Amino acid sequence: MIEFLRRIAAHRLAWSLLAASALFLELSALFFQHVLGLHPCVMCVYERIATLGVLTAGLLGMVAPQKWYVRWSALLLWGSSAFWGLKLALKHVDYQVNPSPFNVCEGFVDFPSWAPLDQWIPWMFYPDGDCSEVTWQFLSFSMPQWLVAIFAVYLLVFVVVAIGNLVKGRCCS
């Protein structure tokens, strides 16, 4: 099993599946925004950036997955993006489940001055929605609740693959 996990992270197919899943999420977000007219909020924009981190990790892992430093750079980016995305999605769910004037998201995104993405790419990163408003549901779950599940799966798979690449078994000594 350890050898399988080690081998799977060294193949482009696994990394391309990771990138494809994140690309699907990004394209879905743009569909919801531009076709269905659902405006993204500040937390939605941050969750998009976390998803872009997973997408970038998948693309980086596809470059040269046999090289340990490329593979581990991609793994660390994947894990940190999945963790950050899960943390953001949980906070977003809290805004929706416990609406309060004291529990609200910021009115604007807080990008660094050297990368104002909301000004450079406003069609993707400009927030004009309300974090506490539930505008869409599927199977009685809101979009942030689905993102909690998605980022939790990303994080779980990351942990399994990372452990498989850390542990030295009899097969690999």
Curated annotation (Swiss-Prot):
Lineage: Bacteria, Pseudomonadati, Pseudomonadota, Gammaproteobacteria, Aeromonadales
Key words, A-Z: Cell inner membrane, Cell membrane, Chaperone, Disulfide bond, Electron transport, Membrane, Oxidoreductase, Redox-active center, Transmembrane, Transmembrane helix, Transport
KW Oxidoreductase (keyword) present: yes
GO cellular component: plasma membrane
Residues in the Periplasmic compartment per record: 32-49, 91-145
Residue stretches spanning the membrane: 15-31, 50-65, 73-90, 146-164
Cytoplasmic side: 1-14, 66-72, 165-173
HAMAP family tied to this protein: DsbB (MF_00286)
Chain's role: Required for disulfide bond formation in some periplasmic proteins. Acts by oxidizing the DsbA protein.
GO molecular function terms noted in the UniProt entry: electron transfer activity; protein-disulfide reductase activity
Domain of life: Bacteria
SUPFAM superfamilies named among the record's database cross-references: DsbB-like
Swiss-Prot/TrEMBL GO biological process terms: protein folding
Main location: membrane
Location(s), subcellular: Cell inner membrane
UniProt record similarity statement: Belongs to the DsbB family.
Record-annotated disulphide pairs: 41-44, 105-131
Membrane topology, record value: Multi-pass membrane protein
Organism listed in the record: Aeromonas hydrophila subsp. hydrophila (strain ATCC 7966 / DSM 30187 / BCRC 13018 / CCUG 14551 / JCM 1027 / KCTC 2358 / NCIMB 9240 / NCTC 8049)
One Pfam family this sequence matches: DsbB
Protein name: Disulfide bond formation protein B
